[in-house]
From Swiss-Prot:
Name of this protein: Proline--tRNA ligase
InterPro entries (UniProt xref): aa-tRNA-synt_IIb, aa-tRNA-synth_II, aa-tRNA-synth_II/BPL/LPL, Anticodon-bd, Anticodon-bd_dom_sf, Pro-tRNA-ligase_IIa, Pro-tRNA-ligase_IIa_arc-type, Pro-tRNA_ligase_II_C
Name of the gene encoding the protein in the UniProt record: proS
Function: Catalyzes the attachment of proline to tRNA(Pro) in a two-step reaction: proline is first activated by ATP to form Pro-AMP and then transferred to the acceptor end of tRNA(Pro).
Keyword Cytoplasm appears in the UniProt entry: yes
Subcellular location: Cytoplasm
Length: 481
């Protein structure tokens, strides 16, 4: 029930944990750093998977599956990659009761094991491109964990593609980061900033990393997806060459891209409130709960509720009836608000006499009278569509209201405690690191969106807020998850 949840303005971190556990989305495991994704949470992941998988296939990708274990010799082939991931790796040293001749790494990501296969599959330009996605689990030995946001084991998808030219691979990188952007905005109702990472923030072994960054309700940033241009680094590490159209030998050009169950954490923190989960309808496996008010002729009320659910389901709206009598209607209202069911419909004997029912939106708690009968599915769909749109607009307005421009370091330090800060940066890793050390804020993204660039004049030269040196552009700073 909602009274288990700490208020956001009292303790935001505790609010998040309380909500995740009270709404039965996930729980702690007896295995250190790991979580149990409960059915309510996994249902959200399934909706995300279904939408993303369709989008991947529409852009020409196919699914495959590669081993969980990676030989140590494979990991060591890409020096920058192993340097980036070694501290987070789990390593298998024994199997079948004996010490292994070669250690096996439990995948933190799959570039190395996949490129060992690509080397066997690619001989000619005719074998390219390869556009493969994998749905899998990965392990990164995290010291400080938080449900969905940072766990030792998590679920994700990782795309790995191989191309004949650098132009093709860059097109793929941008195509996929835009797929993620579309998914975040159209399904999650979560506005994001799309752009590049700085060299110090990019993926280990990548030439460039592109990302989408979202603002949570506490003003912090959350990286919601990444797409990496790997250049020829992994092809060279695995000696993956192909014969070009003009009969030359060249190394293959590569990309990788991924999102994870971290998106569920983003969804929770972007939209939910002190009553519980607020889910955008497109990611709700159950969009409507019908609660019959069981007074008078209970059988007639239940019959009406079942007929309403059937008509909604026939129209493609997932609906269910809670006709149980062990809990009061008030208890049910609070419970389904906690679980984030987008629309609640109440119907009782008097409503049936009037030919109406009462619908309540989860996001605004606004109630409206709807006519019973054949117009009901259309009216409910209108509410769901409005809710999806309004949740995005509310989150966008919140981001805009909590994004400020800073022209001095003092302004910056005050503003970065509350949200995103747009400021000039001199382009050096030294300045970036100093700001991070002193404020815990990082450069989240160098925006690539025309609208965002124009709104905040991101390409306008100026003076670095920290060093006072000339700066060619502004960047987005924030504290982050």
């Amino acid at each position: 029930m909602a009274d288990k949840i700490t208020a956001r303005n009292e303790d935001y971190s505790q609010w998040y944990i309380d909500l995740v556990r009270s709404a039965k989305l996930a729980d702690y495991s007896d295995v250190r750093g790991c979580m149990v994704i409960r059915p309510n949470g996994y249902a959200i992941w399934e909706k995300m998977q279904a939408a993303l998988d369709r989008m991947f296939k529409e852009t020409g990708h196919v699914n495959a599956y590669f081993p969980l274990f990676i030989p140590e010799s494979f990991i060591a082939k890409e020096a920058e990659h192993i340097e980036g991931f070694a501290p987070e790796c789990a390593v298998v040293t024994h199997g079948g009761g004996e010490e292994l001749a070669e250690k096996l790494y439990v995948r933190p990501t799959s570039e190395t094991i996949i490129w060992s296969s690509y080397k066997k599959w690619i001989q000619s330009y005719r074998d390219l491109p390869i556009l493969i996605n994998q749905w899998a689990n990965v392990v990164r030995w995290e010291m400080r964990t938080r449900l969905f946001l940072r766990t030792t084991e998590f679920l994700w998808q990782e795309g790995h593609t191989a191309h004949a030219t650098p132009e093709e691979s860059q097109e793929e990188v941008m195509r996929m980061i835009n797929v993620y952007r579309t998914f975040a905005e159209e399904y999650m109702a979560m506005p994001v900033i799309m752009g590049r990472k700085t060299d110090s923030e990019k993926f280990a072994g990548a030439e460039e990393t592109y990302c989408i960054e979202a603002m949570m309700q506490d003003g912090k940033a959350l990286q919601a997806g990444t797409s990496h241009n790997l250049g020829q680094n992994f092809a060279k590490a695995f000696d993956c060459q192909f014969q070009t159209k003009d009969s030359r030998l060249d190394y293959v050009w590569a990309t990788s891209w991924g999102v994870s169950t971290r998106l569920i954490g983003a969804l929770i923190m972007a939209h939910s409130d002190d009553r519980g989960l607020v889910l955008p309808p497109k990611l709700a496996s159950r969009q409507v709960v019908i609660i019959p008010i069981l007074r008078g002729d209970k059988a007639a009320v239940l019959e009406q509720a079942d007929a309403m659910a059937a008509s909604l389901k026939a129209a493609g709206i997932p609906a269910f009836v809670d006709g149980s009598e062990q809990n009061s209607p008030g208890w049910k209202f609070a419970e389904y608000e906690l679980q984030g069911i987008p629309v609640r419909i109440e119907v009782g004997p008097r409503d049936i006499e009037k030919g109406i029912c009462i619908a309540a939106r989860r996001d605004t708690l606004e109630k409206s009278e709807l006519q019973l009968g054949e117009t009901l599915p259309g009216a409910v769909q209108e509410i769901l569509d409005a809710m999806q749109k309004d949740m995005y607009q509310k989150a966008l307005l919140f981001r805009e209201e909590n994004t400020v421009e800073a022209s001095s370091y003092e302004e910056f330090k005050a503003a970065v405690e509350k949200g995103f800060v747009i400021a000039h940066w001199d382009g050096t890793a030294e300045t970036e690191e100093k700001i991070k050390e002193e404020t815990k804020a990082t450069i989240r993204v160098l925006p690539e969106e025309d609208g965002y660039i124009e709104r905040y004049r991101m390409n306008e030269p100026g003076t670095c807020i920290y060093s006072g040196k000339p700066a060619a552009q502004k960047v987005v700073f924030a504290k982050a998850y």
